[in-house]
Amino acid sequence: MIISSLAFHYVESFGELAEKIARWLVPGGELVFTVEHPVFTASGSQDWHYDQEGGIMHFPVDRYFAEGQRNTVFLGEQVVKYHRTLTSYLNALLQSGFAITGVVEPTPSEELLRTVEGMENELRRPMMLIISARKP
């Protein structure tokens, strides 16, 4: 089993990586990974649009189908991420011989929604994506 958490969106060629992973895994081996959701990485800014009073208006989605490099800030540092569509993630896995076994767009738990201020805004757009696949 290979598990990756929030790393593949820093890799320029996911297709090449998927092919390598397929070679490394034995038949029946599994790949489970999380990435920032393509809706979240599309625009590059990764922030809400705010009104004049500072209230959240909406999350911008722009250039979704324009795959490639995005320069953004993460934890106060400039980083390079690579945006790709959901179709590109899934097709790269399928073309590398994987069978897709799961696709999840996680949402906050009821407890988080009750206890963390502003968490309800995380229901307005997907931020993360979890994909699982098996090598036949």
Regions found by a protein language model. Give the residues of each.
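A conserved beta-strand element that flanks and buttresses the S-adenosyl-L-methionine
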Residues: 3
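Short alpha-helix
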Residues: 68-69, 80-103
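Core SAM-dependent methyltransferase catalytic element
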Residues: 96-98, 116-136
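A short glycine-rich, Lys/Arg-flanked "PGG" loop and its adjoining helix->strand segment in the class I
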Residues: 15-30
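Conserved class I S-adenosyl-L-methionine
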Residues: 30-68
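Short catalytic micro-motifs in class I SAM-dependent methyltransferases
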Residues: 6-9
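Acceptor-substrate binding/catalytic loop of class I
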Residues: 35-48, 73-88
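Class I S-adenosyl-L-methionine
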Residues: 69-72, 106-123
